[in-house]
């Protein structure tokens, strides 16, 4: 009876941690969606960002800096600061993602977002419930991720449609798998953390960022297949 009660308590603690992670991730996605749409409707902001390559690159560099601050320098900042940086990152990502409204129809963007949400939810449930250890699969997926990053950089020069198609397929597969892998790791994270609320809150922000990036990248790769271009 004592063991059963302890097990239930551990499950409740784990679920509370996961709820915090998914809640913060969802807020980040909502902020990104709002900023993406608002930016796409503001001609002045679009002109400032997308007509000047320096402005756009500056935003990208700031985003990389925020990711480092949230994850790499986590021990140097408070959980509240980390949360604020994550929300700022979500807003900036929304601004840079506003370009998709110039390329694809609004209907196809909404449709792809729905497909992404369904896929993400399914893989999250799988990652949480499966008894299979996904560590080995995760290692291959991370290697594959580096592979498509390198291939994407190479294709910036060669502009091969065949390679671009292959990268898109691999991107969908990799981020679908990474969603399950990350959720499984996050579901185990609470056991490894000390009974320190501040540390748990910091790690919840990092976990939210991981899942946020999985979702955004899966969405962008699916959009390559499901998005209807405005000039079609």
From Swiss-Prot:
Chief subcellular location: membrane
Subcellular localization(s) per the UniProt record: Cell membrane
Keywords from the named record: Cell membrane, Membrane, Transmembrane, Transmembrane helix
Bilayer disposition of the protein: Multi-pass membrane protein
Cellular component per GO, a single term: plasma membrane
Cystine crosslinks: none
Pfam families per UniProt: Bax1-I
Segments passing through the bilayer: 17-37, 54-74, 84-104, 107-127, 138-158, 161-181, 203-223
Family label: Belongs to the BI1 family.
PANTHER family linked to this entry: BAX INHIBITOR-RELATED, PROTEIN LIFEGUARD 4
The protein's name: Uncharacterized protein BB_0539
Taxonomic source organism: Borreliella burgdorferi (strain ATCC 35210 / DSM 4680 / CIP 102532 / B31)
